[in-house]
Amino acid sequence: DVPRAASDNTFATASRINMGDTLNGSITETKDYNNYQFQLDSAGCITLNMTAYMRYYCIRIYETDGTEIWYTDSNEWNETVGYRRDEYNIYLEKGTYYIQINGYRREDYDKVTGEYTCRTSFTSSGVTNREDDNSFADANNITIGDKIVGQISVNDDFDTYKFTLSQV
């Protein structure tokens, strides 16, 4: 379990976490957001296993400049059950990110309160390409026959490669 910072409502005061940590939190009348900062040393897939004991919730992922790159919303529970479980697999590039968990519906910003548990994990993609390779000018040089491992992520739409043929 990760102890949350007393005031983690901003990115500057976000609780630092590692993939593999379990996040236990609550959204209250006076605490709208819980922000967590994490770092990936390589490109890969983060998995978020969310169990929410509130009528609905929203998870957002941001880059360090504040750009939102992924979100989930419309996660409304079955009132008879009293909770909702979801699993998300999000492919990201190497870097530092913020996860924000809140009790707002994205489309109308109605707020609810409640508890949640979010288990995190990470699987490296083992990419062999060099980033930034999103243009012809920055393309990765390859040789015919090379094994290439790349990844298309929520924050990286392209991997570009170039090669030369010596015979026609």
Each language-model region and where it sits:
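C-terminal edge strands of extracellular/lumenal beta-sandwich accessory domains
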Residues: 1-17, 34-36, 61-68, 88, ...
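Non-catalytic, beta-strand-enriched accessory regions in extracellular/secretory proteins
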Residues: 19-47, 83-88, 98, 146-168
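Surface-exposed beta-strand/loop patches in noncatalytic accessory domains
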Residues: 25-27, 54-84, 104-107, 151
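Short consensus segments that form the blades of beta-propeller domains
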Residues: 49-50, 109
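A generic beta-sheet turn/junction motif
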Residues: 52-54, 92-94, 167
